[in-house]
Amino acid sequence: LVMGYKYFKDKRYLDSAKRTAGYLEKELISKADYFSSTLDANCEDKEASLYAATATYYLSLVTKGEEHKHYADLTKQAAYFALSWYYLWDVPFAPGQMLGDIGLKTRGWGNVSVENNHIDVFVFEFADVLRWLSNEYNESRFSNFAEVISTSMRQLLPYEGHMCGIAKVGYYPEVVQHTSWDYGKNGKGYYNDIFAPGWTVASLWELFTPGRAETFMKK
């Protein structure tokens, strides 16, 4: 909606975005109750807080004064919750488990939800949000962790001589199983055979082309 407002120069889109943000503030952010934003689970999850942080970040980019500060504060609040899903340490793997054998470090990866206990690269613009918050609030921890996310999520990019158990260059695993949570396929230390190749590439594309939204909003 915010991008629609900027592109079409139609304030109705901005008004709708602000009403949507009002709902997010009332029902999610103020309650710290972020849930049901994954397609396959109806529970608390990381994605809902990422969406809330990104939405209010967009509004912060196109507003000024007290309104800007309000949306920025909401962005920070949602981002702190989202960060609680990210690993600050490296999960150990047993010898013979593929992820351990290829040297995967889990720091900087986000868990998905209380129902789906695996890690993935669902990040999209969140690193940009963190860098922006770092500048907005003079808080280096945000940008420091954005760098951890950005470097860590490169680990499983397949290329010749570094295929990471992936059959073809250009693909990226979706369900990375770092716990003994039973998905019924392969187990800890391996990928699940559930695989959606589209969003993983789209998410990494956003991660590795920083500043796109902010550049667009400032045109």
Descriptions of predicted regions:
Residues 1-219:
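Glycan-recognition and catalytic cores of secretory/periplasmic carbohydrate-active enzymes
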